[in-house]
């Protein structure tokens, strides 16, 4: 086992604080409308330019192991805030730095660290309750656009795009961010259910100009099995041909003789057919087939429940107003499934989302809800260079998370004003002893830090602006972008309550643990390799140089 280096008391805390400050100072320059960029070097490719706090934090590793421990703990604050609300990482880092700095001063002055932590925790619990009381629901497009704009560093086009996307696909809809091809940002909305499987044969194409299969009012056959024998399908094909409607087959696979016969029938015009593979794999495929069945009012033909393809009738088939199949995607528009059945299925999936343990599962389930409930919107980010594209895409992602958080828990006045108002409301809070009172004061003072940092980044004097804001009430604050005072809600400067709440809770949680640290242990740096004394007798070989 490697030898350890151990530091105690003040020595440990000073080192830890230095690490906290290095990381926080790098992150906090990005805060606010006049925040600066940070350039991150990559081991390959061009450097990344970002204003995203968590991206900066993740890049920082310090050489001194004790300092690095401090930095890593603040990195945890940024990551947790990012996981919980998708934004507010810089605010969380600034809050954590302020609490740690003030808290360690109090510890150095002889206060009891555990009581300080209890005081900080008490203040945060009270502050969270006050934040909830200040929160205003965020339901209209204008407010959603404002939240998106602020989170995307005052880029109005991003805010408007996100609001438009939410209008089109609903608050629960899936909105994804992709690289665009031009200079402008674009919004693509896919109505209906789309999945990433295309036609099994190009001979099904009936729109050569677009290279797509478009079928109006088709029947939809859903089979949880491979179809290779055409005999199994003859009864269904004959019934569909009599009905004079097209047929879409969605199955695990359609191959060999079955696929060849379908192609021949289509080309001869006997019956219009298109076949695609079912989306997903394993249990997820079964679930998605069931989703499509619910949406189209059909039944999944599955041998697991004793259904055979030969015995399928028109009643077992789903229907939709239109189906469009491309090389890579299939879109089902206006399925005829009953609204009550669709809502029941959505509720069932939402229950699974609550119980899901992995982010991946949660994301996939959320996609299924969106496909059933509304549709999918894709924001295509346009930029002149790849470096700009990466930076802008990160901002759009942040803005998207912020708007979702705003819809979930409402909004409060932005620009650090909400925390200043909350601190004023709980100023009379007291603990069980003097040390706890100091802890409460530490937390209250830290709540001003985001406002001060925004002002500092804008090149103004933080103390002057903070005093002016504290002299006002309600939503009165300072707009750092235009350098004027007024109502933050009227200025359109809003922060999602969830983002502010998460930032404060995670910052206080980690900072409280750091204040109560008394000892730090790390591996000793490995020394130089030991001198191989045994090889000393071979020195005479140096003379071999003359033989060259």
UniProtKB/Swiss-Prot annotation:
Forms a cylinder of 14 subunits composed of two heptameric rings stacked back-to-back. Interacts with the co-chaperonin GroES. It catalyses: ATP + H2O + a folded polypeptide = ADP + phosphate + an unfolded polypeptide. Together with its co-chaperonin GroES, plays an essential role in assisting protein folding. The GroEL-GroES system forms a nano-cage that allows encapsulation of the non-native substrate proteins and provides a physical environment optimized to promote and accelerate protein folding. PANTHER family: 60 KDA HEAT SHOCK PROTEIN, MITOCHONDRIAL (PTHR45633). It comes from Klebsiella aerogenes (strain ATCC 13048 / DSM 30053 / CCUG 1429 / JCM 1235 / KCTC 2190 / NBRC 13534 / NCIMB 10102 / NCTC 10006 / CDC 819-56) (Enterobacter aerogenes). Gene3D superfamilies: GroEL, GroEL-like equatorial domain, TCP-1-like chaperonin intermediate domain. Belongs to the chaperonin (HSP60) family. It is found in: Cytoplasm. Its EC number is 5.6.1.7. ATP binds at residues 30-33, 51, 87-91, 415, 479-481, 495. CDD domains: GroEL. Its main location: cytoplasm. It is an enzyme of class 5 (isomerase). InterPro entries: Chaperonin_Cpn60_CS, Cpn60/GroEL, Cpn60/GroEL/TCP-1, GroEL-like_apical_dom_sf, GROEL-like_equatorial_sf, TCP-1-like_intermed_sf. This is Chaperonin GroEL. GO terms for cellular component: cytoplasm. Pfam families: Cpn60_TCP1.
């Amino acid at each position: 086992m490697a030898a350890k280096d151990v530091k105690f008391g003040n020595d440990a805390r000073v080192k830890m604080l230095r690490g906290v400050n290095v990381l926080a100072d790098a992150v906090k320059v990005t805060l606010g409308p006049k925040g600066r960029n940070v350039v991150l070097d990559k081991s390959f490719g061009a450097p990344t330019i970002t204003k995203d706090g968590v991206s900066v934090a993740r890049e920082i590793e310090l050489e001194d192991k004790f300092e690095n421990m401090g930095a890593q703990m603040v990195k945890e604050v940024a990551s947790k805030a990012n996981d919980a609300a998708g934004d507010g990482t810089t605010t969380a880092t600034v809050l954590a730095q302020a609490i740690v700095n003030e808290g360690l001063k109090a510890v150095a002055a002889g206060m009891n660290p555990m009581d300080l932590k209890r005081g900080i925790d008490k203040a945060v619990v009270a502050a969270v309750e006050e934040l909830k009381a200040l929160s205003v629901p965020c339901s209209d497009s204008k407010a959603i656009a404002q939240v998106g704009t602020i989170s995307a560093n005052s880029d109005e086009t991003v805010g408007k795009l996100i609001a438009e996307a939410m209008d089109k696909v609903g608050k629960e809809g899936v909105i994804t961010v992709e690289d665009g091809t031009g200079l402008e940002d674009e919004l693509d909305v896919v109505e209906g259910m789309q999945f990433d499987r295309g036609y099994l044969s190009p001979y099904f194409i009936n729109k050569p100009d677009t290279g797509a299969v478009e079928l109006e009012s088709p029947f939809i056959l859903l089979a949880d099995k491979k179809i290779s024998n055409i005999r199994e399908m003859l009864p269904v094909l004959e019934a569909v041909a009599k009905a004079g409607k097209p047929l879409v087959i969605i199955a695990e696979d359609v191959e060999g003789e079955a696929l060849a016969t379908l192609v021949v029938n289509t080309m001869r015009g006997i019956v219009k057919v298109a076949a695609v593979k079912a989306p997903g794999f394993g249990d997820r495929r079964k679930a998605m087939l069931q989703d499509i069945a619910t949406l189209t009012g059909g039944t999944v033909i599955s041998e697991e429940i004793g259904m055979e393809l030969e015995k399928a009738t028109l009643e077992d088939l789903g229907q939709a107003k239109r189906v469009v199949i491309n090389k890579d995607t299939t879109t089902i528009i206006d399925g005829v499934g009953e609204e009550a059945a669709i809502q029941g299925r959505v509720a069932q999936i939402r229950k699974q989302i609550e119980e899901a343990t992995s982010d991946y599962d949660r994301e996939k389930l959320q996609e299924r809800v969106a496909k059933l409930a509304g549709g999918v919107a894709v924001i295509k980010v346009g930029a002149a260079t790849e470096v700009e594209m990466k930076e802008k895409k990160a901002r759009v992602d942040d803005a998207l998370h912020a708007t979702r958080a705003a819809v979930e828990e409402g909004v409060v006045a932005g620009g650090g004003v909400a925390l200043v108002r909350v601190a004023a409301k709980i100023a009379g809070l007291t603990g069980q002893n003097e040390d706890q009172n100091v802890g409460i004061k530490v937390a209250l003072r830290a709540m001003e830090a985001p406002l001060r940092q925004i002002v500092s980044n804008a090149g103004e004097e933080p103390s002057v602006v903070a005093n002016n804001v504290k002299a006002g009430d309600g939503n009165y604050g300072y707009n750092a972008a235009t350098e004027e005072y007024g109502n933050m809600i009227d200025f359109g400067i809003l922060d999602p309550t969830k983002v502010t709440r998460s930032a404060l809770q995670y910052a206080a949680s980690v900072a409280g643990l750091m204040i109560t640290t008394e000892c730090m242990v790390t591996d000793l740096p490995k020394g130089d390799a030991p001198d191989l004394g045994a090889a000393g007798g071979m020195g005479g070989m140096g003379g071999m140089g003359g033989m060259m």
